[in-house]
Amino acid sequence: MGLPALPDAAIELHASASDWRAAVELAGACLSRSGAAEAGYADEMIRMIDEHGPYVVIAPGLALAHARPGPEVLRDGLAVVTLATPVDFGHPHNDPVQVVLALAVHSPEHHLGMVAELANRFNDSDAVERLAEATTADQARAILGVAA
């Protein structure tokens, strides 16, 4: 299956966010800028977290925001936002979060597989820290193993 490309428009490094909602909105804006999703997809990701809690915080310092495939998803897309100051999502063990990934998947059949594939990129224990410290889009892509 493979992960979607990560264009420059889908990357925002050392951004500022007042809280987790603002961080997810930034990630959604990156997906929108890159043409992968409509602006409303950020609202869907936030709604999922409101409904199900901070399940998106999958590792210390890392959130993988996503929502179900729907009309807001234009094509498969990936976004990366690193935060200058980490924010809390309310996770009992993995807060605060400094790296927010956003994933938009067009096909319901590929949704869970793509979430799992992206999560597996962080089996390397220092990957979150390296991504948080990335200063260029190319560094972020290299850490994730994705193309532009």
Language-model-detected regions and their locations in the chain:
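Cytosolic covalent-transfer regions centered on His/Cys nucleophiles
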Residues: 1-148
